[in-house]
């Protein structure tokens, strides 16, 4: 009995001795790295003054409402590879709200795609298009959610004259001709969208704007 009690006492001592002290130093280090948590709180959608924007193109409620319509407007998809694809695609073809503003399938298809389903899951290659003719990017489209807070856009951060691209001016427009737009000192998102219109076979001009009812 005395031996059993001794073993129990020894085990109890070992257990309590192994109790870890709180990692206060690690917590402090994490807090320093994170900084002020308030900087991670996004502003309300109508608090336009708190959303990053280009001074040359400030946000207004009218521009926001226009953008919401243009995002899903297929009327400007007139640079299609084949007549069958004319005006059958928009930004919303590949950036699906219900899918986090990304494709709801393995890859998004703009021009050269057909169908949609409920949330983009049924879009597929149009039979009349060769695989090499469809507008599908080499990498999955990024989400366009909250991209106003992104200083450099695209997977490799190639668009935008600020942020990580400061000091890389000599490379703009060299390996990727589209990045020459960075020399215009536009916001990353604006520069990418201007080039994106060409890449995604969209065209905006006065005639189409009026024809689609966006200007009286």
List each model region and its residues:
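Bacterial Sec-dependent N-terminal signal peptides
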Residues: 1-24
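Periplasmic c-type cytochrome electron-transfer domains
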Residues: 18-216
């Amino acid at each position: 009995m005395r031996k059993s009690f001794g073993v129990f006492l020894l085990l109890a001592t070992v257990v309590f001795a192994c109790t870890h002290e709180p990692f206060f130093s690690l917590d402090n280090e994490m807090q320093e790295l994170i900084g002020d948590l308030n900087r991670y709180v996004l502003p309300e959608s109508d608090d336009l003054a708190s959303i990053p924007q280009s001074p040359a193109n400030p946000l207004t409620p009218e521009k926001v409402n226009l953008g919401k319509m243009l995002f899903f407007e297929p009327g400007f998809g007139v640079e299609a590879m084949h007549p069958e694809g004319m005006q059958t695609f928009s930004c919303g073809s590949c950036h699906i709200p219900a899918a986090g503003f990304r494709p709801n399938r393995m890859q998004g298809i703009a021009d050269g795609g057909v169908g949609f389903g409920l949330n983009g899951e049924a879009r597929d290659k149009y039979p009349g298009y060769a695989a090499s003719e469809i507008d599908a990017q080499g990498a999955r489209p990024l989400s366009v959610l909250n991209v106003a807070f992104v200083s450099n856009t695209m997977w490799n951060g190639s668009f935008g004259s600020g942020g990580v691209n400061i000091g890389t001016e000599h490379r703009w427009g060299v390996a990727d001709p589209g990045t020459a737009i960075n020399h215009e000192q536009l916001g990353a998102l604006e520069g990418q969208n201007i080039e994106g219109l060409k890449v995604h076979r969209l065209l905006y001009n006065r005639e189409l704007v009026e024809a689609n009812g966006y200007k009286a």
